[in-house]
């Protein structure tokens, strides 16, 4: 311990050296001294002889070397812990930021689906009472996108389908995906669906349903009577039928009595086709809940108005009375999104 003994013999100003605690605060080898450069440590030795005597200390002393080694090891551990803590803090901050953004997105999404929101139609709780059945006048007054009017041959009732306002939650000011003209619709890849008398965006246009329905009920644009005016005075000529078939017109009118019911049934077929094929999109008219409800009661009222249907019994080819069997059944629920046949 020559270096320590020599350090003890150096004159100092009131400093004491504890041989049992060589690394006390007043020692020239104090813990605080090792944080600075060697030259600075030398200057901290408070003695009249200055640096010359201090430089003669044997800094390679075994005890000093051990302390230096342990001190450097502690420094490395501190630096490693500090780096890990910094990474942990930054990681927590990033995760918290993403959590906040996700929570905000979820809250905005929930708000958009709340009843009364202009972002999407209201979803009715299955445990709440169903919408009240529309009155007979409502069923007659609510129509579809193809503006037309019709009159019944059995009575003098006249009903219009072109002035029905959309429900409050429908965003009528949204930009139209197919534009506002036949040329613009074609340029955007939209498809004309006659039963809707509308150009439909390709994501929710079903050419297969158009062809299927046309095979079942015929080509409405060539087989129904069409007129250019509400007074039914200016008939659409056969030469003009291709324009109707191509969706290249502004507005036409028909007195064909089954037109409204066939339009409603077409929408239902589109919905069932989408469910069957797992399609995620539907045109705005057939998706409209108000329109679906209106169609159901409109067709029901029309059927009940046909007295012959209720009074007359159907007879088969052999002259036997046709009856319809209604056994009491018990149905399970299936996911609405299922594409499996039930």
UniProtKB/Swiss-Prot annotation:
Location relative to the cell: Membrane
Biased composition annotated in UniProt, kind: Low complexity: 144-155
GO cellular component, one term: membrane
Keywords, comma-separated and alphabetical: Glycoprotein, Membrane, Transmembrane, Transmembrane helix, Virulence
Region described as Disordered: 1-22, 118-186
Keyword Methyltransferase annotated: no
Glycosylation sites recorded in the entry for this protein: 248
Parts of the chain that traverse the membrane: 87-107
Membrane topology classification: Single-pass membrane protein
Entry function: Part of the gene cluster that mediates the biosynthesis of the phomopsins, a group of hexapeptide mycotoxins which infects lupins and causes lupinosis disease in livestock. The role of phomB within the phomopsins biosynthesis pathway has still to be determined. The pathway starts with the processing of the precursor phomA by several endopeptidases including kexin proteases as well as the cluster-specific S41 family peptidase phomP1 and the oligopeptidase phomG to produce 10 identical copies of the hexapeptide Tyr-Val-Ile-Pro-Ile-Asp.
Protein name stated in the entry: Phomopsin biosynthesis cluster protein B
Species the sequence originates in: Diaporthe leptostromiformis
Underlying gene: phomB
């Amino acid at each position: 311990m020559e270096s320590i003994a020599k350090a003890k013999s150096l004159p100092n100003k009131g400093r004491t050296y504890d041989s049992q605690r060589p690394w006390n605060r007043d020692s020239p080898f104090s813990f605080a001294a090792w944080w600075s450069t060697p030259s600075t440590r030398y200057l901290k030795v408070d003695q009249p002889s200055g640096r010359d005597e201090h430089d003669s200390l044997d800094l390679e002393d075994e005890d000093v070397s051990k302390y230096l080694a342990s001190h450097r090891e502690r420094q490395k551990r501190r630096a490693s812990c500090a780096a890990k803590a910094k990474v942990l803090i930054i990681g927590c901050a990033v995760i918290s930021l993403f959590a906040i953004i996700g929570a905000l997105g979820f809250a905005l999404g929930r708000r958009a689906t709340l009843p009364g929101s202009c972002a999407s139609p209201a979803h009715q709780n299955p445990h709440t009472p169903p919408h009240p059945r529309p009155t007979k006048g409502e069923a007659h007054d609510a129509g579809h996108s193809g503006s037309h009017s019709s009159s019944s041959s059995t009575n003098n009732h006249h009903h219009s389908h072109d002035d029905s306002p959309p429900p409050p939650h429908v965003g009528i000011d949204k930009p139209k995906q197919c534009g506002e003209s036949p040329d613009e619709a074609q340029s955007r890849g939209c498809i004309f669906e006659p039963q809707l008398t509308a150009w439909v965006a390709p994501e929710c246009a079903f050419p297969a349903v158009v062809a299927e329905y046309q095979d079942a009920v015929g080509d409405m644009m060539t087989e129904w009577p069409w007129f250019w005016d509400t007074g039914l005075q200016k008939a659409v000529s056969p030469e003009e039928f291709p324009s109707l078939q191509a969706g290249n017109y502004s507005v036409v009118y028909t007195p064909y009595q089954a037109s409204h019911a066939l339009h409603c049934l077409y929408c239902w077929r589109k919905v069932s086709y989408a469910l069957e094929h797992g399609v995620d999109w539907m045109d705005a008219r057939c998706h409209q809940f108000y329109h679906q409800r209106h169609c159901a009661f409109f067709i029901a009222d029309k059927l009940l108005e046909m007295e012959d249907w209720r009074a007359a019994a159907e007879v088969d080819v052999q002259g036997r009375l046709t009856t319809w069997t209604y056994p009491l059944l018990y149905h399970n629920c299936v996911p609405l999104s299922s594409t499996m046949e039930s």
